[in-house]
Amino acid sequence: MSIQVMMQMLGQGFLVSLQLFVLTLLGSIPLGIPVAFMRMSKIAPLRWIARIYISVMRGTPLMLQMFAIYFAPYYVFGISLTPDSKWTACVVAFIINYAGYFAEIYRSGLQSIPRGQYEAAEVLGYSRMQTFLYIVMPQVAKRILPAMGNEIITLVKDTSLAFAIGVGEMFSTAKALVASQVSMVPFAISALIYWVFNFVVEMLLGAAEKKLDYYHD
C-alpha cells in the first residue's frame, strides 16, 4: 500500500478524531459552568452532588467511563446496542469527563478573585450581572486559560481512547494499517498528525493569552 493511500485513510480517521474533539469542547465547556456554581453553592445537597460528580469524573479512567456508558443501557435496561451506540457513548463519556475537569478550573478561577472587587463594583453602582461580566469574567478568563489549554491539549491525545469501544478514529485506523501492512509507518504518520494538530492548538491558545494581556494581575 502506498504512503498516499495510507495518508488518505488516516486523514479520514483524523476527521472522526476532530469531530470528537470539537463535540467534546462544545459540550463540556458550557456544562462545566453550572457544575462549578453547584460546587460553590451554599446549598449543601447541590454542593455535594457536584463534589461527587467531579471526584468520580477525575478519579476514574475515561476508558472505564466509556465502557460503562456504552454497556449500561443493555445490562441495566435491556436496550439493544446499535452501531451508533458506540459513537454516542464515546461523545457522552468525553463530555461529562471533561466537564468535571473544567468545572474545577472554573471554580478555582472564580474563587481567586478578591471579594473586595465585588464590593468596589457595588459601590460604583454596578449590578451583580455587570460586575460578573465586565470585572470578574475578564480576570477569570486570563487566570484559567493556561489550565484550560492543558486540558484541551490532553483532549487531542485522549481522542485516541475511542478505539477501545470500536470507534473508527485515527489511532484505530493506524493500528489496523500496522497489522495489515506489517509496517510502523502508519503509526509514524498518525503521530505526526497528532503533533501538528496539537501545535496548531497551542498557537491558538497562545494567541488567546496574548489577547488577554491587557489585564495585569
Predicted regions: what is each one?
Residues 1-217:
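Transmembrane alpha-helices and adjacent helix-loop boundaries
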